[in-house]
Amino acid sequence: MSFPSIHRHGYPFICLAFLCSCIGFALSSSLGVIFAMITALCAYFFRDPIRVIPLNDALVASPADGVVTSIVEVESPLNDGKTVTRISIFLSLFDVHVNRVPVSGVVKSVEHRPGSFSSAGSGGAVNENERVRAVIESSVGGHCIVVEQIAGVLARRIVCDLESGKAAKLGSRMGIIRFGSRMNIYIPAGMPVSVAEGHTVVGGETIIASLDADMATVHKDLTFDKV
């Protein structure tokens, strides 16, 4: 049996918890057990499993593990006057926190936007919470796909590894939200969406939309890779 790897941003938490467990065992067995459990939970929270990624640049994959909470048409967050479809995904404490690039293309911008730390499940979190917003110009069709990592009550540390001007590959790791929260992805209105509210999605694996209007062509003879 193999165990999933750990994301590098999890090691400080795991090492600190492990050190506390060693000190705890030196003081009392019960205290040591408590910190050992915390160490195991940290390792679980920061797990980074291999994913089976579709090798098709015409697809849009889920950027995170979680549950689709809403699919609505809204004004573009880029304030360009366009209408887009926003797909919101809620990440619980028990979901994988590592985020994945939703579409292949070139990163046009990465912006940190300060804000509040409301519950990720609340309506105010959509527009008011602190976030990191990345814009990717898709290699197929030249669409601007916007993806947002949103902070929450517990998730107050967002890490985004994307860099403006660099290429981004569908399914590759793009960062992490510590201890669960929410992600939004904005795609052009009218683009075929493959999920519905309430669906459980897997980051980098679950196909949520297509850049090609002909879904039959897009899904024909798909190949995959493990990343």
Swiss-Prot record:
Protein modification: Is synthesized initially as an inactive proenzyme. Formation of the active enzyme involves a self-maturation process in which the active site pyruvoyl group is generated from an internal serine residue via an autocatalytic post-translational modification. Two non-identical subunits are generated from the proenzyme in this reaction, and the pyruvate is formed at the N-terminus of the alpha chain, which is derived from the carboxyl end of the proenzyme.
UniProt cofactor note: Binds 1 pyruvoyl group covalently per subunit.
Membrane topology: Peripheral membrane protein
Family named by the database record: Belongs to the phosphatidylserine decarboxylase family. PSD-A subfamily.
Single Gene Ontology MF annotation: phosphatidylserine decarboxylase activity
Organism lineage: Bacteria, Pseudomonadati, Pseudomonadota, Alphaproteobacteria, Rickettsiales
Name the record gives this protein: Phosphatidylserine decarboxylase proenzyme
Catalytic activity field: a 1,2-diacyl-sn-glycero-3-phospho-L-serine + H(+) = a 1,2-diacyl-sn-glycero-3-phosphoethanolamine + CO2
Protein role: Catalyzes the formation of phosphatidylethanolamine (PtdEtn) from phosphatidylserine (PtdSer).
KW Lipid metabolism (keyword) present: yes
Pathway: Phospholipid metabolism; phosphatidylethanolamine biosynthesis; phosphatidylethanolamine from CDP-diacylglycerol: step 2/2
Keywords: Cell membrane, Decarboxylase, Lipid biosynthesis, Lipid metabolism, Lyase, Membrane, Phospholipid biosynthesis, Phospholipid metabolism, Pyruvate, Zymogen
